[in-house]
């Protein structure tokens, strides 16, 4: 697996060169390392399904790449109902909302997406 070890690594020098002259701040993702990390998770999963946590990757395109990298990745664990509705509107399926919600706007958005065929599972706390 490729590694990044900080300012002394060859990757750091490559990043500095690639970003020279760019207006900062910006987001830069080494997709090779991202997918290597995903492959490592798959290898350690023992074949068990892995649900991608959206709060760890806030970029839809990167989420799509990780999900497509292995059939072991199955669905997305969303931070909020609103986020689940947003992801469903952008073609994501098999969504689970990690935290209970009573936000009427977010719940209406989820219901609208479910009416259009989205699969969104909401969690609840039972007293």
Question: How would you name each of these model-derived features?
Answer:
Residues 1-10:
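N-terminal hydrophobic targeting/anchoring segments and the immediately downstream early-domain regions
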Residues 4, 22-36:
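N-terminal basic, low-complexity leaders that serve as flexible interaction/assembly modules and, when applicable
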Residues 9-14, 80-84:
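Short, acidic/polar
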Residues 10-27:
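Generic N-terminal amphipathic, Lys/Arg-enriched alpha-helix
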Residues 35-38, 111:
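A generic alpha-helix structural signal
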Residues 37-45:
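N-terminal signal-anchor module of multipass membrane proteins
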Residues 51-127:
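Active-site-proximal beta-alpha core segment in soluble small-molecule metabolic enzymes
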């Amino acid at each position: 697996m490729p590694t990044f070890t900080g300012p002394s690594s060859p990757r750091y020098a490559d990043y500095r060169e690639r970003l020279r002259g760019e207006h900062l701040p910006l987001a830069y993702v080494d997709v090779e390392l991202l997918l290597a990390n995903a492959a490592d998770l798959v290898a350690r999963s023992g074949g068990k399904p892995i649900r991608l946590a959206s709060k760890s990757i806030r970029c839809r395109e990167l989420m799509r790449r990780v999900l497509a990298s292995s059939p072991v990745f199955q669905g997305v664990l969303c931070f909020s109902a609103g986020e689940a509705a947003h992801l469903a509107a952008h073609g994501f399926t098999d969504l689970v909302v990690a935290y209970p919600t009573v936000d009427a706007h977010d719940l209406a958005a989820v219901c609208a997406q479910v009416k259009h065929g989205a699969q969104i599972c909401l969690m609840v706390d039972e007293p």
